[in-house]
Amino acid sequence: MLQAYKYRIYPTDEQKVLFAKTFGCCRFVYNWALNMKITAYNERKETLGNVYLTNLMKKELKAEHEWLTEVNSQSLQSALRNLDTAYTNFFRNTKAVGFPRYKSRKDRQSFLCPQHCRVDFSKNTITIPKAKDIPAVLHRKFRGIVKSVTISRTSSGRYFASVLV
């Protein structure tokens, strides 16, 4: 059984800049993919899969927008997976789920790091790709392997890390 632990983190100024870039890049990729899905369905009545969009993002989108290479690519891929899940949930014929919407800067900002994450209780730090040790308040210890870490920012400017074990 998977369990999540949410910790308050205190990133440095460099890490805050990296997080802001990652939030923006994930939002950009999500909105780009949603636009591609809507356009493909309206023009050709076809649906674009997650694998196709991931390959297109790696080849074409990163060539057009070089700033996408500054952030963790797995976080961008997880944004595409989130969109694919939202699309699948919409077409399941339940009335509880609406059509996926474009992401706004005003929405909750978060990104997922699915691999290469580490929590060090002796140093009170969390490590994710492209960001070295992030100071954190690790108030609760856990046992197990870290599956993923989700970094989020609240509207008041506080940062949190949700560790999935």
Task: Walk through the language-model features, giving the residues of each.
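Nucleic-acid substrate recognition interfaces
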Residues: 1-165
